[in-house]
Structures are given as structure tokens and as C-alpha cells.
Design a protein with these regions (language model features):
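Beta/alpha (TIM)-barrel catalytic core signal, keyed to glycine-rich beta->alpha loops juxtaposed to Asp/Glu
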Residues: 1-148
């Protein structure tokens, strides 16, 4: 891969489902343009990878970025923020992902035009620092439950 990149046959190299250590090893051989790991409001397994990508200015592409687990339930923090903003919970979950890091590049999958339109509109949702922190805390608490 490194030789092909040097020869111009490959312009950019991305990695998927890797650890920080694996990224560092890859960086010894070629420039890493992006990392695609599972990450969302409640799945924080790749938190350290995202932080490392941010420090290295590597694009981070979260797969399954809309997952919110029980946070999407009626009366949850996510539900309350969504209602207050006049948005769908999935839009707020996506807005949280977008605000989380400047290197974040979510590409949520969808099979319906309505959901595509909602996903695009999520980019214009502005979360206050308080809403972001409340969602972050709720997501971490949910994540911690799954790790116990």
C-alpha cells in the first residue's frame, strides 16, 4: 500500500475498525487519510481513536452514527432535547456526533428520502453547550451500563 501510494496509484488510504496503536503503526508506512470505526452517542468504544484522529487531523467516519439505544425512549434526555428543538431524536443524535469533533464525517445510511432529508437537516441543528453536555453525559452513562 505504501509503495502504491508513493507511486501515485493510491491517492488516499483509510483504515477501518482500528485501534490507536494500529493507526500509529500504519502511519510509519503511509499517510492515513481517514478512520472508519463504529461510534455514536451511546457506543464510545472508539473514543480514544477519535481523540487521536483529532490530534492528527485524520478524518473520522463513524459507522452507525444514529444509534441511540434507550436514549431514544420517550422522556429521555435525547427525546427532551429533540422536542425542545423541534427535531427528531435521530437528528439530535447526528447533531451531537457532528459537534463532538471537527474531524467527524458521519455518513448515515438510509433507504427513505424522508430520512435522508432529516439527516441532511441535522447539520443545521445547533446544540447549546448545555444540551451537548447533557447528551454526552447520558450517552456515556448508557455506554457504561453496557460495559459493566
Amino acid at each position: 500500500i505504501a509503495d502504491m501510494q508513493r507511486e501515485g496509484l493510491i491517492r488516499h488510504v483509510g483504515l477501518s475498525e482500528v485501534s490507536v496503536e494500529q493507526i500509529k503503526i500504519a502511519q510509519q508506512y503511509f499517510t492515513v487519510a481517514s478512520v472508519q470505526n463504529r461510534y455514536n452517542l451511546v457506543d464510545r468504544f472508539s473514543e480514544d481513536v477519535l481523540d487521536y484522529c483529532e490530534s492528527q487531523n485524520i478524518a473520522f467516519i463513524p459507522w452507525f452514527p444514529l444509534a441511540a439505544g434507550s436514549l431514544a425512549n420517550e422522556g429521555s434526555v435525547l427525546d427532551e432535547v429533540a422536542k425542545r428543538l423541534g427535531a427528531a431524536p435521530a437528528q439530535v443524535a447526528l447533531a451531537w456526533v457532528l459537534k463532538r469533533s471537527s474531524v467527524m464525517l458521519p455518513i448515515p445510511g438510509t433507504s427513505k428520502v424522508k430520512h435522508l432529508e432529516e439527516n441532511v437537516a441535522a447539520a443545521s441543528i445547533v446544540l447549546s453547550d448545555e444540551d451537548f453536555a447533557a447528551l454526552d453525559a447520558a450517552g456515556k452513562a448508557e455506554w457504561n451500563k453496557t460495559q459493566a
